[in-house]
Amino acid sequence: MRTYEIMYVVRPNIEEDAKKAVVERFNGILASEGSEVLEEKDWGKRRLAYEIEDFKEGFYNIVRIKTDNNRATDEFQRLAKISDDIIRYIVIREDQDK
């Protein structure tokens, strides 16, 4: 099984309830596609290194998952691209210990 770390940034002008719904939705997508969620971190609101879509800040979230296929990460990326609430994301495959 492969381990992935996914970091995504939610737009800063979102209401708290809507932010929670976005986080639950995208974390649920990862869990529903046959992956195991190892860890979830909410880094809170942080300043961006550069402006993205006229935003200078964003809510950072990090999720670590373990999966044996790419369905979870592919579906996450597909939906994150079309979501107005996520302004940036990155999916990183962690090295396997040998």
UniProtKB/Swiss-Prot annotation:
InterPro entries given in the database record: Ribosomal_bS6, Ribosomal_bS6_sf, Ribosomal_S6_plastid/chlpt, Transl_elong_EF1B/ribsomal_bS6
Tree of life domain: Bacteria
GO MF annotations in UniProt: small ribosomal subunit rRNA binding; structural constituent of ribosome
GO cellular component: cytoplasm; ribonucleoprotein complex; ribosome
Keywords, in A-Z order: Ribonucleoprotein, Ribosomal protein, RNA-binding, rRNA-binding
Protein family (similarity comment): Belongs to the bacterial ribosomal protein bS6 family.
Organism this protein belongs to: Staphylococcus haemolyticus (strain JCSC1435)
Protein name: Small ribosomal subunit protein bS6
Primary gene name: rpsF
Chain's role: Binds together with bS18 to 16S ribosomal RNA.
